[in-house]
Regions:
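Histidine/cysteine-enriched polar flanking segments
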Residues: 1-152, 157-260, 267-352
Length: 352
């Protein structure tokens, strides 16, 4: 069977701007098997998993399970598990860590404060090597296991601080992963590329190759960030920030296609509700034939204006449009063919 990752690669689908969105990550060690919905389908008490999901909802915190690479026998004994909190916004990224014996204690965290970037001194600061989290949950998509688990194992053998993670979206970009402290995700990754990404993160930099975007931002903003970085060849992780993002009327016909830059995909903070979710391949009904009326097929494409600032004082207005005009591909293994939504960068204009 042709996999979703193979189909996406063959279609040269852009990976930029498809990262999972999370201003703050809560990563909870859980050995043993993971189900499709890992927080409630693993050896974690499902009542705790559901409560964590509810506590994080709408706060900017994303909860995921992690485990060390390798075989995952789980004898169900009550043992201390490693937990991480990581805030990925460029103003002041941080990682906190602890070992907890009862995961229900995590429900005492102030999720709203954590999502806003305030850890209030909880747990201990993490000051070790950059952390790599590789998506490996084969119950969600076989590509994550077939491609992700060997990569995670190879990274662990090489000495990287590698973990497996339940779900970060974008199965068809497997092997896919993100690196902390900066929260940039990568797709179609190889071991040499990840090792370079870790070395770059150690120096406060990112890689532009195979980069899906920074999880702190929604998809239009991810696209805008990467477009500016490509334009000025900026790799310092915290040199770029997103100042503002808003939905705007689409450009006039003709201008939109003439102005497309790199095809970087993304979406931005305040307009998250209007943007496709984190590389899951939300399909645009205007172009997939799923529209219920002819009028919808002619609906204007969602468009955003994103203001991007450099710490040296420069800034740009980046116009980003949602499109679904690529080669039909499955968004995950076994799903029907469709045209996954992408973010097209139409223009990058300097301000001031």
């Amino acid at each position: 069977m042709r996999t979703c990752a193979t189909a996406s690669r063959d279609a040269t689908e852009p990976v930029a701007g498809t990262s999972a969105t999370a201003r703050t990550w809560l990563l909870v060690e859980q050995t043993g098997p993971w189900g499709t919905e890992a927080l409630t389908e693993s050896h974690l008490d499902p009542r705790v998993g559901r409560a964590l999901e509810a506590a994080a909802d709408g706060t900017g915190v994303r909860v995921a399970l992690v485990r060390r690479p390798g075989r995952h026998a789980d004898c169900h004994r009550s043992a201390a598990r490693r937990v991480f909190l990581a805030h990925t916004a460029p103003s002041r990224p941080w990682i906190r860590t602890a070992a907890v014996t009862g995961p229900e204690a995590l429900l005492d965290l102030d999720f709203a404060r954590l999502g806003a970037g305030e850890h209030d001194g909880v747990w201990d600061p993490y000051d070790g090597e950059p952390l790599v989290f590789v998506c490996t949950n084969g119950k969600r998509d076989r590509c994550c296991a077939v491609l992700g688990r060997p990569l995670a194992a190879e990274l662990a053998v090489s000495g990287a601080e590698a973990w497996e993670v339940t779900h970060i979206g974008g199965h068809r970009f497997s092997p896919t992963l993100f690196v902390l402290p900066y929260g940039y995700a990568y797709g179609r990754a190889s071991a040499p590329l990840v090792k370079d990404a870790v070395a770059s993160a150690r120096e406060g930099r990112i890689l532009l190759d195979h980069c899906r975007g920074r999880s702190a931002w929604e998809r239009p903003a991810q696209a805008a960030d990467l477009a500016v970085r490509e334009l000025i060849r900026e790799e310092r992780a915290d040199a770029i920030d997103i100042v503002h993002s808003e939905a705007v009327p689409p450009p006039h016909d003709g201008a939109e296609h003439a102005g497309e830059k790199t095809g970087n995909p993304s979406r931005a903070g305040k307009d998250a509700k209007d943007s496709p979710r984190e590389g899951e391949g939300t399909q645009d009904p205007r172009r997939t034939g799923t529209a219920s009326t002819t009028g919808l097929l002619d609906a204007p494409a969602p468009t955003w204006a994103v203001t991007v600032a450099h710490r040296d004082g420069r800034s740009w207005r980046v116009t980003v449009e949602q499109r679904a005009d690529g080669t039909p591909t499955p968004v995950s293994c076994g799903s029907p063919l469709g045209r996954p939504a992408r973010m097209a960068v139409l223009s990058v204009l300097p301000l001031g």
